[in-house]
């Protein structure tokens, strides 16, 4: 099984996110600025994404966030690798944590497009970040549960399942990912996989006294 989501080769839901690039315009930073900032090797002749609303306030941070937004929408974007290199040089891979926090906030407002975009950017910047995949799985799941169109639901459902699978590979201790992955397998009629996944969930949550864990454990025991 692959241990990362190759969105640049296989992007199930990008078609639903691409319209959001309409708020971005692209411009090149001046050669003198790039030299001064020590970024010429990464950004020479590379168009940089700016938001129409931020043209008076262009900072290292706004540029990095806009780059993350673009690759979150379109992981096959021509300058994706330049953008990731810029983010890692201007900040570091912990930049992904801020994107995850933003994504969680968007998801809490039921804006699952924006949430998915942040999480997709996060695991491109930090491919080992289990939380980014887990949160992406949750956002895709919440999106398809509100969806009505069959193709939309199918694409988000498949994306959600793969994200939860990869979350458990990146962090085999991430109990919540096993919980949702089990339901993903049940949805697909993969009952043996669901059973094994839920047994792992019960093993990981044994003796955990966190809020609501006991109810979830009972619910899963009832299903096994």
For the regions a language model picked out, list residue spans one by one.
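Canonical positions in the second alpha-helix
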Residues: 122, 166-167, 201
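TPR-adjacent "capping" and linker segments in tetratricopeptide-repeat scaffold/adaptor proteins
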Residues: 53-56, 82-100, 213-224
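TPR alpha-solenoid repeat register
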Residues: 132, 177, 211-212, 220
């Amino acid at each position: 099984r692959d241990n990362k989501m190759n969105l640049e080769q296989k992007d199930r839901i990008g078609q639903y996110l691409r319209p959001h690039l309409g708020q971005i315009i692209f411009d090149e930073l001046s050669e003198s600025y790039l030299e001064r900032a020590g970024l010429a090797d990464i950004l020479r002749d590379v168009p940089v994404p700016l938001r129409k609303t931020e043209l008076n306030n262009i900072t290292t941070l706004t540029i990095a966030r806009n780059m993350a937004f673009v690759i979150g929408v379109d992981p096959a974007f021509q300058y994706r690798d330049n953008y990731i290199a810029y983010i890692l040089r201007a900040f570091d891979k912990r930049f992904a944590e801020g994107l995850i926090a933003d994504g969680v906030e968007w998801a809490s407002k039921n804006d699952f497009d924006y949430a998915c975009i942040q999480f997709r950017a996060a695991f491109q910047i930090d491919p080992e970040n289990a939380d980014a995949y887990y949160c992406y799985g949750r956002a895709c799941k919440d999106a398809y549960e509100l969806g009505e169109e069959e193709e939309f639901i199918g694409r988000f459902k498949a994306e959600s399942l793969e994200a939860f699978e990869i979350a458990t590979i990146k962090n085999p201790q991430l109990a919540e990912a096993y919980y949702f992955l089990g339901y993903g397998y049940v949805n697909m009629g993969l009952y043996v996989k669901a059973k094994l996944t839920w047994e792992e969930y019960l093993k990981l949550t044994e003796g955990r006294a966190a809020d609501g864990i006991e109810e979830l454990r009972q619910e899963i025991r009832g299903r096994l």
